[in-house]
């Protein structure tokens, strides 16, 4: 850790040394301006060192960076960490699977109808720059309202060949199946009918929960 820079692609180094349940956070690189962070931690349950990535309000473990032995983990970090941080601040087309390209997600014409702000939410991730997370899923687009810890995301899962929607309301996951679709055309129809009402519902429930 003595070799780690204080700043890296706009991310600020933070020494954590904190315990949450069976997870020991060692250190993090944080960019609050873009709501991204990367945390190196040890998971007691699995006896493994891991890397946790936060994008907006979504957190996931990077499966390519897991190791039971510290020296192996350090090797993985040296090989991957720079690219991980770089790709968080600048979209890398190489992270997009050929399956995503074949579904025409990045060139989806409907994205021109997704406004930068909608019902108090801000477009945080857009279809032209999808984000790979875990379990074969990509974030297609993401509307965020950080002021109430709430969002709405459309995902695509490559294994199921399915689009689906998921919200967070006061940082608590909330799913329904209204947006489940096999094709972009089907998803587009459902978004036209249900996107605005869903965002309104999320805001209303977030507001009520904070009373």
Spell out what each predicted region is.
Residues 1-29, 83-149:
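Negatively charged, low-complexity tracts enriched in Asp/Glu with abundant Ser/Thr
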Residues 10, 161, 196-197:
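Structural alpha-beta junctions
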Residues 35-76, 144-186:
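Intrinsically disordered, low-complexity regulatory segments enriched in Ser/Thr/Pro
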Residues 59-105, 169-211:
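Mixed-charge, Lys/Arg-enriched low-complexity segments
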